[in-house]
């Protein structure tokens, strides 16, 4: 089991504006293991960006303890590192943002080289390093292009290369794909996954999109109004969300609400027979491999009319949603429900026949 590379314990962040006190982050504890791709999701104003800025102490917390890669960096209300040690620690933490923050008058390679200006490498070593970084992000052929000559995705690749210039152990992505189109977003996420695998890079993803969490992360924390309301593996959160906000994020990411709206307009649902019911089946892991609907027909003579089905792979484990009309004798449907529960399927009755 990997050890925690980032430990944020009981973090409070309070701002004072004139006569107002704003509690931006309230008693948040998050531990992120080495090699994680860890998502922090929430709407604007949830406190997620403010929280992650304490990792490299761009924002000092009001209270709490911060440990990064085994070193206590903040405790008892003050920074625990010398100025030199803090600078070195910050070199271990790269950041990328929604806005690429590239220098318009410098080429792609010059933008990456700028991050090495305080490095102890020789001029030749720096040049080789820049070439390697641009190759790593798939942009070596654009080394001499200026930002104005690059697409949004290419600019973000330059920003990623620059963030990796000092060989960080941690990469913080603050809404880094928000300004990109869906195709480019997928390409950037695929690149981040590749960097995670190749370099053992720990990635902290700040986003308001659960789809991104679903595509790339292995763990996720959900924030609301400065409070961490739910945290766990992506599989656990998607298959068994406990908080209303988490459920809202997930239904948006899976499209299940949109599917239900269309399903409810179908005649078979509008005029559901007395011996039928509309049900949502949620299942994960090994239960996706079993021919469960065939089994309940053979055992209980309960038919299943599939109106919607979707299976996705979350952290290498299949997770599925299905909306079906189950039809049969009342006692047989009850027995079929029980059998599905025993097989690890969550059954929600959406409507019963009249």
Swiss-Prot record:
| Membrane topology field | Peripheral membrane protein
EC main group:
translocase
Instruction: Tell me which Gene3D superfamilies the record gives.
Output: 3.30.70.260, P-loop containing nucleotide triphosphate hydrolases
Which residues are ATP-binding? 42-49
Subunit (UniProt) = The complex is composed of two ATP-binding proteins (MetN), two transmembrane proteins (MetI) and a solute-binding protein (MetQ).
According to its UniProt entry, the function of this protein is described as: Part of the ABC transporter complex MetNIQ involved in methionine import. Responsible for energy coupling to the transport system.
Annotated PANTHER family: AMINO ACID IMPORT ATP-BINDING PROTEIN, METHIONINE IMPORT ATP-BINDING PROTEIN METN
Which family does the record assign? Belongs to the ABC transporter superfamily. Methionine importer (TC 3.A.1.24) family.
Name of this chain's protein: Methionine import ATP-binding protein MetN
């Amino acid at each position: 089991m990997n050890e925690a590379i980032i430990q944020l314990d009981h973090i409070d962040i309070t701002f004072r504006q004139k006569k107002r006190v704003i509690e931006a982050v309230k008693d948040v504890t998050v531990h992120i293991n080495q090699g994680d791709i860890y998502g922090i999701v929430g709407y604007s104003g949830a406190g997620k960006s403010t929280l992650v800025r304490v990792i490299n102490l761009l924002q000092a917390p009001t209270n709490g303890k911060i440990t990064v890669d085994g070193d206590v960096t903040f405790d008892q209300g003050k920074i625990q590192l010398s100025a030199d040690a803090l600078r070195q620690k910050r070199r271990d933490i790269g950041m990328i943002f929604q806005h690429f923050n590239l220098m318009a008058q410098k080429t792609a390679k010059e933008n990456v080289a700028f991050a090495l200006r305080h490095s102890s490498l020789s001029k030749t070593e720096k040049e080789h390093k820049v070439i390697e970084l641009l190759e790593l992000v798939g942009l070596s052929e654009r080394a001499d292009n200026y930002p104005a000559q690059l697409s949004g995705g290419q600019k973000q690749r330059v920003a990623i290369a620059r963030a990796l210039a000092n060989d960080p152990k941690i990469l913080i992505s603050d809404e880094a794909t928000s300004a990109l189109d869906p195709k480019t977003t997928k390409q950037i996420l695929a690149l981040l996954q590749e960097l995670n695998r190749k370099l053992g890079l720990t990635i902290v993803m700040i986003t308001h999109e659960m789809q991104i969490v679903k595509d790339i992360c292995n763990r996720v924390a959900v924030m609301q109004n400065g409070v961490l309301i739910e945290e766990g593996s992506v599989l656990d959160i998607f298959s068994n969300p406990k908080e209303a906000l988490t459920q809202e994020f997930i239904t948006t990411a899976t499209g299940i609400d949109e599917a239900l709206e269309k399903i409810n307009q179908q005649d078979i649902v509008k005029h559901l027979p007395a011996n039928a019911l509309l049900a949502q089946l949620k299942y994960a892991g090994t239960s996706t491999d079993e021919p469960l609907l065939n089994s309940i027909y053979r055992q209980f003579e309960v038919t299943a009319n599939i109106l919607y089905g979707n299976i996705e792979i979350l952290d290498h484990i299949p997770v599925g949603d299905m909306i079906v009309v189950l039809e049969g004798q009342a006692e047989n449907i009850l027995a079929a429900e029980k059998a599905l529960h025993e097989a690890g399927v969550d059954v929600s009755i959406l409507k019963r026949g009249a």
